[in-house]
Amino acid sequence: MHALQAALGARDILGTDSGDNVDMLTLASIDHVVLTVRDIDATIDFYTRVLGMTEVTFAGDRKALAFGAQKINLHVAGAEFEPHAARPAPGTADLCFLAAVPLAEAIAHVRACAVAIEEGPVPRTGATGPIESFYLRDPDGNLIEVANPRG
């Protein structure tokens, strides 16, 4: 059993009780999400320079942004890879990332990159409990939340 499954009380990745009956699908984590963007170069610059992600090229010339054990695949508006969302559009995402540094350092870095802080720091509730967050926008206007867990 995976550590996350054990922590969440999940039986196994397929949700089986004894291996005989599948009663539900149990998901373990997010592998990747897709952002549809207007300008892939501006997006890569923002996410690497401001948020510290790593540019990844895969499957020929496809682009992604890696961080932690996750990635964001990038699709250019009007030239999306199949299959894709029913109505892919730039600027429609609202994403929250956990920072690997104290929030004050993250805020100082974002400001040093001449990116406006839209709100924060403010208390919020994350997937595993209380967080402290601040908000900014990427080049397409997606709302980006950067957070630290609160003790």
Feature map (PLM): residue ranges:
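Short, basic/aromatic recognition patches
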Residues: 118-126
